[in-house]
């Protein structure tokens, strides 16, 4: 499955900063999980859908420049807190507040 540029940009930035992340993408959603120091997980998500012409991204608000960002309360819990659309650079600022493992 093709990965959106915004997700690739985020993952490159995380790698450049040596910030660990996990790919939890599914059939119709790109998910980048970033474990936080407090045991929570920051989930950065881009939804997409498949058409007869191929993969279309952009179900996420703010796409193509932003990802939906939510807190997951544990690795086993898919219940999201309120999400917000953020650029990869804004996500790094959020990580500065929460700290990463």
Predicted regions mapped to residue ranges:
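Low-complexity, intrinsically disordered/propeptide-like segments
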Residues: 13-17, 39, 45, 70, ...
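Amphipathic alpha-helical segments
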Residues: 5-20
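Amphipathic, interaction-prone secondary-structure segments
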Residues: 18-66
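Ampiphathic alpha-helical segments that act as solvent-exposed interaction surfaces
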Residues: 6-10, 64-101
């Amino acid at each position: 499955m093709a990965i959106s540029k915004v997700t690739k940009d985020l993952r490159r930035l995380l790698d450049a900063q040596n910030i660990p992340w996990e790919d939890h993408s599914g059939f119709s959603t790109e998910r980048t999980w970033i474990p936080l120091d407090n045991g929570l997980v920051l989930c950065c998500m881009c939804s997409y859908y498949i058409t007869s012409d191929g993969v279309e991204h952009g179900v996420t608000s703010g796409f193509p420049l932003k990802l939906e960002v939510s807190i997951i309360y544990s690795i086993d819990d898919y219940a999201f807190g309120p999400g917000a659309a953020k650029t990869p650079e804004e996500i790094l600022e959020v990580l500065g507040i929460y700290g990463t493992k």
